[in-house]
């Protein structure tokens, strides 16, 4: 019998990243992370994770979990069956991640939901009809953008630059430092498709669940 579980996704915790609230800035100079200490940042993300994720749930971490190896121990305090898709800062040995609770470690993970999970956004040629949405990290507060021709009543009225509907960034800065349930992922994708006039369907498991 197939067992179904709730699934969540999140990226770029940077647990233990010293002074990251000072180093990471928005374009207007305001802080990207609203914390005043590394400990506050770590504890806030762990608390929000555990408030949403239960032990039997599955969580996909899309890379850059920690910068300093010693902070990997914090992962032990986070609920759920943990799966890592490596990012550019996940440079330690597989066994180091397994020791703190990651059951699987991947480069890119592909789902029947037609999501591709990755750390760095993939080249558009990889996000084809077969895999229509790249759920990714790495960009923090930014998004993959596209420029298209705007048409009104058959006439070109100019160019529009907007978030690319085939990409969704799930970095902590864009998820309120909380994992997103797969239902929430689909809702965000559908809203973006509505906003941009994109019509490709997303197939998802009922209630954000899927085969374990």
Task: Indicate where each model-derived feature is located.
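Extended recognition/assembly regions associated with phosphoester-bond processing machinery
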Residues: 1-62, 66-212
């Amino acid at each position: 019998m197939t067992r179904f579980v709730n699934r969540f996704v999140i990226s770029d915790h940077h647990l233990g990243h010293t002074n990251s609230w000072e180093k990471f800035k928005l374009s207007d100079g305001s802080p990207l992370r609203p914390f005043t200490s590394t400990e506050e940042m770590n504890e806030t993300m762990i608390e929000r994770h555990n408030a949403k994720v239960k032990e039997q749930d599955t969580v996909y971490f899309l890379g850059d979990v920690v910068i300093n190896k010693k902070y990997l121990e914090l992962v032990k305090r986070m609920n759920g069956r943990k799966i890592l898709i490596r990012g550019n800062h996940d440079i330690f040995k597989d066994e180091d991640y397994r020791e703190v609770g990651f059951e699987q470690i991947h480069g890119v993970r592909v789902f029947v939901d037609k999501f591709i999970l990755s750390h760095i956004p993939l080249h558009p040629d990889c996000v084809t009809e077969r895999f229509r949405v790249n759920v990714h990290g790495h960009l923090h507060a930014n998004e993959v953008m596209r420029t298209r021709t705007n048409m009104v009543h058959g006439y070109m009225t100019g160019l529009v630059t907007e978030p690319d509907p085939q990409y969704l960034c799930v970095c902590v800065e864009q998820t309120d430092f909380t994992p997103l349930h797969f239902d929430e992922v689909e809702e965000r994708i559908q809203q973006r498709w509505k906003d941009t006039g994109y019509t490709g369907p997303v197939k998802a498991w009922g209630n954000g669940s899927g085969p374990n």
